[in-house]
Amino acid sequence: MSRRRRTTGWLAAVSALAFGASLVAATSASAAGTFNIRDYGATGNGSSNDSAAIQKAVDAASAAGGGTVRVPSGTYKSANTIHLKSNVTFQLDSGSTITGASGTGYDAAESNSNDQYQDFGHSHFHDAMFYGDRLTGIGFTGPGTIDGGGHLITGNPGSGEADKILSLTRCSGLTLNGVQLRRGGHFAILTNNCDNITSDGLRIDTASDRDGWNVISASNVTVTNADISANDDALVFKSDYALGAKLPNGHVTVTGSHLQAKCCNALMFGSETCGDFSDYNFQDITITGAQKSGLGLVSMDGANISDVHYRDITLTGVRSPIMEKIGTRKRCGNSPGVGHISNVTYDDITATGASPSFSPTLWGQSGGNRISGVTFTNVHITVPGGNGTMSTSVPSDNGDYNPNSLGTRPAYGWYLHNADDVTFTDSSVDFAADDGRPAVIANAGRNLTFTGFTVERGSKSPYDLGFQSVTGYCVTNAKTTTGAAAKVNSSSSTASCGTTPPPSTVTVTAEAESGTVTSPMQVQADPAASGGHYVTVAPGNNSKSSAPSGGSTVIPFTVGAAGTYRLWGRVIAPTNDDDSFWVRVDNGAWTDWNDIATASTWHWASVTDDSDSDAPVLPDLAAGAHTITFAYREDGARLDRVEITNDLTLVPTD
């Protein structure tokens, strides 16, 4: 009995010592701000499930007010979802790998009442190796690896299966530096409604699985020195309805990166395009393969996409080097209309296409939903060629967003349809194999200019540049690769060289809540609003005699052509005492927009000037970037959406 007591006492002493050592280690780690997962029980042997230890380290760092979770060299199997916490960064040391596992230990996909607006993978976020919602100050730094290990699902996962490595929603302040992600299932990274994202030296290799990084509804993003190889889309910018709202996107820069997409798109906008996109800059990028689009930009669900700029980009082995398309899918929960694409520039681009059918294409819709304001400077594209002559009629459109949604283009080089204000300067297109089609065909456009444009002429091509129903085209100093003057053919078109071209129709729309909203103006939810939200002032705030010094929404917008514009707002003015705003364009004088037609439902109203007998406000705008500001005047007035158009007879509709 006494021996057993002594043994028990010895064990108790050892336990006390171990506990004390653990406490000292934990206290030391906390003090240093670094939490080593091995101190919390991780084995790193590649076979034991280290998820619990990793989670303990995360929780300890969070309890300490934030810190770094260190992953030392070793292979750490993680068979359960790790729940991220604010102000916690993972540091993966050289030689460290966190690997996924088979089985059903991951969090099940949550329910989502908005499933019908995007596919399963985009609609669910919990079913991931790492998940977080409404977090701030989180990150992953390398040079270690997170590897799904071939265990993550590329289709729709069953309960307990994961289909992504990193899944984040409604986060702010994400850092991804130097870490490598491999075999990510459907997504290596899925972020939705996150802002202030920075990434340097991120490496993704998910060519055996599906997507690299889906950046959805994001603002203020900087990506440098990324290397992303994917099977589906490599780096893609989207805006869906998975979070139950139409959300803005913008202020994005990607530089010094390499992208590859084995089956699909390398650098892509869409197809999910509910919210508007503005201010994107891509520079010094190499793309080495894309079986769909190299540079793809589509608006399928009502998005207005503007101010997108590509510079110093080299593409090889891409089926469609450049593709812009406006579609009419309208798969978004806010009953969207048809979108716009405007103010897009391509500078110093060299591309080699890999499909004779998917010629570089700009495809807009008729009416006010055309592509506009696109410039190409020093853009040189080589396509496979190899087609014979064919009809020059408009190809079929199956309504999809991919390059193969359109039939074989009647031009081997550029095909433009419903595109206005497009300019090519010092650019060229040629083929690898003789082709009987013209180099360029433009159909139903305005103000198309080709200056210093070089084409290769096929032996059976009837002409080099063709214009069909184009109002205002100009071709100067265009030649073939042999030095001969380029042949131009036109039908139902007018040349505009040396004349002032007719104005193009420009219509820009934007959500009121997409601007910079300052107190006491506030964003409120309403499912009947076009984006699910609107802007109004907090009750009790009125400023009838003059515009307030604060309390407004400042909405940026860009117009592709100079001219006189009319302003519209989608509003609710419940009574005659709640029917006004202060409005100004850029830093101009304030206008008292009063006497808005009263109604308890959303409706469009022209912005008018109360001091000028309620005449419509018609500012003269230069082409380029502007702002429109709405400040409060009477509480109760609500603003959902704005529209700026140079079609002075246009009346917006829902």
What are these regions (language model features)?
Residues 2-3, 630:
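Short alpha-helical segments used as structural interaction elements across diverse proteins
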Residues 3-11, 17, 23, 28-501:
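Extracellular/periplasmic carbohydrate-active domains that bind, remodel
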